[in-house]
Amino acid sequence: MKAVILAGGSGTRLWPYAEVRNKAMVPVANKPLCAWAAEAAFAAGLEGVVIAAGPHSEQIKHQFMGDERVVVIPVGATKGAAFTLAAVKAQLSSSFVVLNGDTLYDPKDIAALGESLSRGPSVLLAKVPEGEHADHICAEASGGRLMRIEGHPLNPMRYRIAAYGFTPECWPYIESCSTLMDDITVGMMPPLEGFLEMIVADLLRAGIAVQTVVAESNCLDVDKPWQLLKANAEMVKKLCSALLADELGEGSVIDPSVQVEGHVHLGKNCTIGRNVLIRGNLIVGDNTEITEGAMILGDAVIGSGCSVRQYCLIDGGSVLGNNCVVGHGAEFSGVAFDTVYLYHYMEFWGILGRNVDLGAATVCGTLRFDNGETEWRVKGRRERPREYANATYVGDFCRTGVNAIFMPGVKTGVYSVVGPGVLLAEDLPSNKIVILKQETTVRDWSPDKYGW
């Protein structure tokens, strides 16, 4: 049995992190989402993976280069997930599982879905958090059978569909999927798009039973920036909690002066130098140095080729990508993609895209005077995230000047610059530079002013 991983969406809700990459290539604990999905599929006992790749498909091909178990099929732009799935039919000759490329799965849930699929079409159900039913296409089940679906319902519903299991007999329904959703209430306005849930609804209308498996995990869907921050925090907790003893790779050393309140996993040729403080479990890649009094205050994941030094502070739950520098007095909490440079008394909480360079003393606000959460605009819709709303989100390849300030919840697009001394209170689009224009006065001055 194979798994199909869908990676065809544009990821506009995840702005700015899906501009220069496929949404499924966004990293969680330094591994792309689609790589986590493929790993979970193989751990569940599936034999192969087919990835239906939309934007930036070449990045996904590069990620799985040399892995003969994974086939990446570019599908271009489609009219929705159902059409993305139909585009890879030639790769599938028997029953198969469909996973979303932007979702984190537990292998046990995928294995349970595969077992259910042996008895007919099946779906994996994840519980909808309280109050979030209007954000999802929801489902109801009874007695292990799917009863109905409804798009973004007004009244609470218990589940959403996180993954699918289709038999070959389902292909006529997959290939005939409409772009006009029927399963909505009066007043709802669905986009013209082929959703996988519409295929399942057609199966039900045809009298075909669809079995259900309720996921033990939350099957976290990474659709918006704050969900990416949450996904990384949860993955750090999961990976670090599995670390039960110190594990040092070849050539790695820990100085006797280091204070470790937990366990450490080091890759090859790593150094933890004098006076470092580690309060939690720490996972580190290869060729990384953590030296000169650096403080890591909780569980963390740090990539390869990093330099963490000179009394900097990394908060618990954080992720540093590969080839990052966190230097003199820098304070960081959140997620940094690869090749990020943090230095000289800067302070940041949120997400930093790859190759971001923060100027000295760049800081971000994290607390509003009303003690509330920042209201966001996601594709024009007002949203108030329950978590991480006040974090700062900086896109890939951005820079800041010295003393730049981010207000709570602001975002910058890719390839943008926040100039010296700027207080950024609103989102900055991609490919823009904002410079502070100040008014100054020049007057004469001399020793005469002092009575000479």
Predicted regions and their residues:
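N-terminal nucleotide-binding beta1-loop-alpha1 segment
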Residues: 1-18, 436
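Conserved N-terminal catalytic core of the sugar/cofactor nucleotidyltransferase
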Residues: 2-5, 13, 27, 31-99
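The conserved acidic donor/metal-binding loop of glycosyltransferases
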Residues: 100-104
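Extended, small-residue-rich solenoid/repeat segments and analogous flexible loops
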Residues: 193, 201-295
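Glycine-rich hexapeptide-repeat left-handed beta-helix
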Residues: 309-319, 323-452
